[in-house]
Amino acid sequence: MAAAGAAATDLEVVRGKRSALFFAAVAILLGLPLWWKTTETYRAPLPYSDISGLNALLLRLMVPVTVVFTRDSVPLDDQEKLPFTVVHEREIPLKYKMKIKCRFQKAYRRALEHEEEALSLGSVHEAEAMLAEPEKQAEGSLTVYVISEHSSLLPQDMMSYIGPERTAVVRGLIHREAFNIIGRRIVQVAQAMSLTEDVLAAALADHLPEDKWSSDKRRPLKSSLGYEITFSLLNPDPKSHDVHWDIEGAVQRFVQPFLNRLSVAGNFSVDSQILYYAMLGVNPRFDPASSSYSLAMHSLPHVINPVESRLGSSAASLYPVLHFLLYVPELAHSPLYIQDKDGAPVATNAFHSPRWGGIMVYNVDPKIYNASELPVRVEVDMVRVMEVFLAQLRLLFGIAQPQVPPKCLLSGPKSEGLMTWELDRLLWARSVENLATATTTLTSLAQLLGKISNIVIKDDVASEVYRAVAAVQKAAKALALGHLSSAFAASQEAVTSSERAFFDPSLLHLLYFPDDQKFAIYIPLFLPMAVPILLSLVKIFQETRKSWKKPEKID
């Protein structure tokens, strides 16, 4: 009986050891991998090497320039060398991680018969009408006509002319270094019509040191897929003024043609409103000498905040909102004039705020007070008002007057208020700005994901990152080839995809789940099971060691 009991006890011990080993094996070989897999943070692979390479991206902006030489514009020996191509390239000195080079590829050729006929006319406008084929010119390309040194096409004191389309005229020269001298003039004209250091600096204003560029460079709106424009009439004294404005007709006549030309750069929506009893919030100063009131330049920033609370919130808008306010001062503060920094009245009686909009003060003619009872009817001169608002709108979009070379005649804008090469120059700037924004966004996202390991990277986020990187590379390649339209479209796609990835809500799912909270959750679950298994394994290990140390047999 004792032997049977000992055998049963040994069998139970062996069974216990096997059970402990089985539980330990299941926990280690199956439980731990399953727990690790089900609790890991999913992170889809990203092109980190491609993103880091974007910091050293070289943007080569190529402007195709066709140079057409008429008879007697250069010496005969030089005319026999035509056609040929000359490339002028220079680096833009900006303190920015992305290198930018402007490349003017000048294709020289002789003028065709119809071009010779057009350029022999009496005025440059007649020649432009005869040469007008803007639909055949690609976006971003330029055509420069070189005429005879003694041609009457331009005024005698003018050496060059910049037209409203993608064309310019430059006087030739009978000189042995004619090509070199004329080539420098052509580059100056081409830069004024396309890419200058100021244009690119304004586009990269948010990415450059603040002390390098003035506030004027930060005036243009940031690139966006759309913009909202609101025209507001502020009538603080409706008891004295019955103001009428034909804003709908003025928008259709003046603003809409301008926005139609700008539609390639974004979508636009326009609305209007009338606000009564809306005050500026700043007390104007009375001038006894002129019996008028004035707003000093230093007080203008304080005008916007009180008025902005009445305009409606723009926080709900997906796009930037531009406000254009027409303020009719109350009778007690009429007439009201805006002063510049020297204390002189501003000619337009208006001012604008960068990336916000503009305000114009519209004074009522004092003669109507004598002939009418209050409230007097006020008919707003919308032509004068829209001239001011359109000028402000151009500045807010970064469409400023170009820095033309000396003795250069600049044509006025067309009826739409925008020249074709100005639109191209805007697209150049927007493309560079979009690429800089997309590169910064992707780099910041890669750094963030590298520092915080428990951020989830879903497949759709990774696909947006890949799409953004590919779009940046595509846009850079298109810019180097001079394909402005496709480059701008690719740059917009790069910004959209990069920001969609950066602001994806799924990135925040496990962001606030640190390691100490993980231990606080998992220890109560696994400790009661792990302690008995570990103790059993220790006991089995100790008994196994004892069994290996058998006592030596003594005779």
UniProtKB/Swiss-Prot annotation:
Job of this protein: Component of the glycosylphosphatidylinositol-anchor (GPI-anchor) transamidase (GPI-T) complex that catalyzes the formation of the linkage between a proprotein and a GPI-anchor and participates in GPI anchored protein biosynthesis.
Parts of the chain on the Cytoplasmic side: 2-18, 533-555
GO biological process: attachment of GPI anchor to protein; GPI anchor biosynthetic process
Stretches assigned to the Lumenal side: 40-517
Binding site for a cardiolipin: 15, 18
Signal peptide: none
Main location: endoplasmic reticulum
Superkingdom of this protein's organism: Eukaryota
Subcellular location: Endoplasmic reticulum membrane
Annotated TM spans: 19-39, 518-532
Family of the protein in this entry: Belongs to the PIGS family.
Pathway listed: Glycolipid biosynthesis; glycosylphosphatidylinositol-anchor biosynthesis
Organism: Mus musculus (Mouse)
Protein name, as recorded: GPI-anchor transamidase component PIGS
Glycosylation sites: 267, 370
Keywords associated with the record: Endoplasmic reticulum, Glycoprotein, GPI-anchor biosynthesis, Membrane, Transmembrane, Transmembrane helix
InterPro entries: PtdIno-glycan_biosynth_class_S
GO cellular component assignments: GPI-anchor transamidase complex
